[in-house]
């Protein structure tokens, strides 16, 4: 899963961007990059490999800027190379992107016919060229972004800057997570709040279709109908959110050794000593709903998928309920038949895995009995 960080501030934002990327490393990635505006020019550094390699390059080049965007990439379109790393640039426009542009091949063909040259294999470069094309028509960045996204099919989150606008960052959320962090005289965007906790604990959780205009002293949110809207800010306890490795060599080792405590914390407050569930933890009528379950469908990706297979043994061996486990990326694209008495269980560390969310949306269309989502981020989608 990729990660986005963006900042508009009076101070140099490069350290904020790098620290944000480090705090998103738990998502996994194969390359990283950032871009800032300095003296009306875009300064970009990208590296395949670890964020620390990008950090060294940024320090050596003495990159400095009061506005910038950064990204960790997990390759989907194109190999994990420096040329494919974000941000991508078209003219004076720089873009970072999470998600998948499903019609990128058609857009690439169209843009090539209009004279645009592609230097990467990514779907993201299409977005940069689209914004540049629309900017040539409108001469206004916000209007250009709004027009460009009308051509995009898929799920995406975007962060966009323009060299001539050192005080404004444009962001978009459509089917891929993005939050706004609120500071004092500075504002931020991130794929999740973990990336921004060193600089703020006040967040606005965006909705699909939102286009956001960030300045140092203000933010403006336009909804899917292009109306200006106000969204409530949430204040988080930073102590409750940890992304460090706690002395372990890597996150996998940390998570392996944390399993006993994680299981205990998960059960506490949800299962009573009598063995009955605490309905308040699962929502109203939970016991009645669970009693009606005759089949369980588990959907997940990666190691969450492996955890789902462990759960299958428990559901069938202990509860005596039939259970099926499937990879979300396979499930969402096939025609599936679910019994009406199915409990649809999704597992996602971040609560934002795109394929898992898409699978859940498809299942809800079928009229399942209920859904149960297991994740580490209560404020996620």
Whereabouts are the PLM-identified features?
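Conserved short alpha-helical segments that host acidic/polar catalytic motifs at enzyme active sites
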Residues: 1-245, 249-250, 258-294
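Internal active-site segments that recognize and position negatively charged phosphoryl groups
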Residues: 250, 254, 304
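Glycine-rich phosphate-binding loops that contact phosphosugars or nucleotide phosphates
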Residues: 291-381
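Generic, well-ordered alpha-helical scaffold segments in large soluble proteins
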Residues: 110, 114, 130, 134, ...
């Amino acid at each position: 899963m990729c990660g986005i960080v963006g900042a508009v501030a009076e101070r140099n934002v490069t350290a904020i961007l790098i620290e944000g990327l480090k705090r998103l490393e738990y998502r996994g990635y194969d390359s990283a990059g950032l871009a800032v505006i300095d003296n009306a020019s875009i300064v970009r550094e990208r590296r395949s490999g670890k964020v620390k390699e990008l950090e060294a390059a940024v320090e050596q080049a003495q990159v400095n800027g009061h506005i910038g965007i950064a990204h960790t990439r997990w390759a989907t379109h194109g190999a994990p190379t420096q040329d494919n790393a974000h941000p991508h640039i078209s003219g004076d426009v720089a873009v970072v992107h999470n998600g998948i542009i499903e019609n990128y091949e058609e857009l690439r063909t169209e843009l090539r016919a209009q004279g645009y040259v592609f230097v990467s294999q990514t779907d993201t470069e299409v977005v940069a060229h689209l914004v540049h094309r629309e900017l040539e028509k409108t001469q206004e960045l916000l209007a250009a972004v709004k027009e460009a996204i009308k051509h995009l099919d898929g799920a995406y989150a975007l962060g966009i800057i323009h060299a001539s606008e050192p005080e404004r960052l444009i962001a978009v959320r459509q089917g891929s997570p993005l939050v706004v962090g609120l500071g004092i005289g500075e504002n931020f965007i991130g794929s999740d709040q973990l990336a921004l906790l060193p600089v703020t604990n006040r967040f606005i959780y965006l909705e699909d279709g939102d286009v956001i205009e960030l300045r140092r002293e203000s933010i403006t949110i336009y909804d899917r109908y292009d109306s200006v809207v106000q969204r409530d800010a949430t204040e988080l306890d930073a102590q409750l959110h940890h992304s460090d490795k706690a002395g372990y060599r890597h996150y996998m080792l940390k998570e392996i050794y944390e399993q006993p405590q994680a299981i205990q914390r998960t059960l506490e407050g949800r299962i009573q000593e009598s063995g009955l569930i605490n309905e308040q933890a699962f929502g109203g009528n939970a016991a009645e709903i669970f009693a009606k379950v005759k089949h369980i469908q588990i959907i997940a990706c990666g190691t969450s998928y492996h955890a789902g297979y462990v759960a299958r043994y428990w559901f069938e061996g202990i509860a005596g309920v039939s259970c099926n486990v499937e990879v979300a990326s396979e499930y969402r694209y096939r025609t599936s038949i679910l019994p009406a008495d199915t409990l649809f269980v999704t597992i996602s560390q971040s609560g934002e895995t795109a394929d898992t969310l898409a699978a859940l949306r498809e299942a809800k269309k079928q009229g399942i009995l209920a859904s149960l989502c297991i994740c580490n981020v209560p404020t996620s989608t």
